[in-house]
Amino acid sequence: MKFNKVKLVIHACVLLFIIISIALIFHRLQTKTHSIDPIHKETKLSDNEKYLVDRNKEKVAPSKLKEVYNSKDPKYKKIDKYLQSSLFNGSVAIYENGKLKMSKGYGYQDFEKGIKNTPNTMFLIGSAQKFSTGLLLKQLEEEHKININDPVSKYLPWFKTSKPIPLKDLMLHQSGLYKYKSSKDYKNLDQAVKAIQKRGIDPKKYKKHMYNDGNYLVLAKVIEEVTGKSYAENYYTKIGDPLKLQHTAFYDEQPFKKYLAKGYAYNSTGLSFLRPNILDQYYGAGNLYMTPTDMGKLITQIQQYKLFSPKITNPLLHEFGTKQYPDEYRYGFYAKPTLNRLNGGFFGQVFTVYYNDKYVVVLALNVKGNNEVRIKHIYNDILKQNKPYNTKGVIVQ
């Protein structure tokens, strides 16, 4: 009888232990669920993705662009010969006095499938996309929807930092925010910007120039917040569609997939494909694909005052060393003494633009290399454009 009582007590203790263990496990799971970092939550389609899916439901691939090249023009013949002899792998577009004079592909868009680069090949423009973000920002300024001197926290109240960050400092890359570290865990722009806010400011870099993708990701989020529209929708409704940039698309737009160049780099075993696996978080700073002709078309139309009035356009394109534009860099591009320049490099692709009032030269490659050497030779030595263009300290009307 005594043995049975002991047995019952043991069974009861075991049962109680099991119940308590189950309760503790359940509590831990509940706590873990509620304490998941919002940066790493599972997400559905982002606003950008939703907009692009809807936009492309009935969209077909754009019409093909023809090759433009006049072998009877000595300078363009020389450019063509130079690109071939230097084993250039990419595409070139050159506008002269507002007209397309050269558009040609070299090498391969996709080495594995043997698909050649053509005027239709669209390249990942990387940081050259900051130019588009800068244009959207400038438009919102002119519409009096933002003040470039306001702190970012005015537009994103949750973006709290140890020191105030004006939008202007983001635009000029002098916010002091720690350099953005991309992660495969971030699945959209929101998660990227929350990660940027969480890392905060490096006090040693505050108010000092430090190029940082994070600055333009935050600006992209500000643009979304102010307009109530996704970055992609802002781009298309305010730039892409009005200026008829039909050979430009975001990285995940299905109708354009067959035209997107693959990026490569040489390593010890030969040519290696660099898979762009973090573009979902790069709205505003590096997930746009363009043909060189579309970029040239964009710049030409800005020069022709189709986006801003002369009063806005001329200082924007030409001033530096002035109160309004103290630095060469502004709104995603550089105004330098002999030219204006924008550039981006991402996942083996490099997209570079040199331009003045006479020429717009766009050179895009998809095998990682020094694009600057080639475009300098074309612009300075063949087209003979190494001469004064913008003057420091001069206010332009």
Curated annotation (Swiss-Prot):
Q: How does it sit in the membrane?
A: Peripheral membrane protein
Keywords associated with the record: Antibiotic resistance, Cell membrane, Cell wall biogenesis/degradation, Hydrolase, Membrane, Signal
- Inducing or repressing factors: Transcription is dose dependently increased by the addition of beta-lactam antibiotics, fosfomycin, and bacitracin.
SUPFAM superfamilies of this UniProt entry?
beta-lactamase/transpeptidase-like (SSF56601)
Show the Gene3D superfamilies listed in the entry: DD-peptidase/beta-lactamase superfamily
Tell whether Mitochondrion is among the UniProt keywords. Answer: no
Catalytic activity, per the record?
Answer: [(4-D-Ala)-(2-GlcNAc)-Rib-ol-P]n-[Gro-P]m-beta-D-ManNAc-(1->4)-alpha-D-GlcNAc-P-peptidoglycan + n H2O = [(2-GlcNAc)-Rib-ol-P]n-[Gro-P]m-beta-D-ManNAc-(1->4)-alpha-D-GlcNAc-P-peptidoglycan + n D-alanine
Alphabetical GO biological process terms: autolysis; cell wall organization; positive regulation of single-species biofilm formation; response to antibiotic
Q: Give the protein's recorded name.
A: Teichoic acid D-alanine hydrolase
Name its species. Staphylococcus aureus
